[in-house]
Amino acid sequence: TYLPVVDCLPYKKGNDIVEQMKVPAGAVPDSTSIEFMYTKNGKEVRFDQANFPTDFDSTYVYVDRKDIVVKKGNGLVAKIVDFSLQSVHGTDTTAAIFANQKPYVLVFAKEMKGAESWKNQFQSIYKKLQSQNIEVILVTPEADRAAQLFGNINILISDATVIKTAARVTPTYFLMNGSRIVEKVAAPTIDQLFTTLNSK
């Protein structure tokens, strides 16, 4: 499967992910208030932080809380709001990965279902990149399954929705320089990644 010819996403070739995560100048966020829901003596009680009950004690049983927008912001938000790379132990490694001074490849795979169909090609690409001393990192929400399929490779976890936005097909290869996307290809056009890599 090929990537779309025109990439209008914030994860397109040439973009810097860190720059895309910055809130635009002049952005005004929504103003919110927290509404708490408790029960006391079998009755539901709702209040916000400004009207906290004076008799609040252990007889109040927490039910829920909601953020209520009291004043709408101007809608200016970062183009990328939820990108993160986690280790298999849950440590956020995004900044450490982006601090990488050498080119590296992030391979995005939204799911491992059907991975058998691209496993051999991935392993061939992986070996070729390794022979050029290029670090390869598989990014997926399904780290356990990826480890079963691909063995001892570097795996990071990211949310499936984030991956779906960043990479329209599985797998998608990002040649990275720090946090900048130097090249972005799907498997059928992987030669373009090597051409770009070898032209540096």
Question: How does the language model describe each region?
Answer:
Residues 4-200:
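Extracytosolic and intramembrane catalytic regions of membrane-associated proteins
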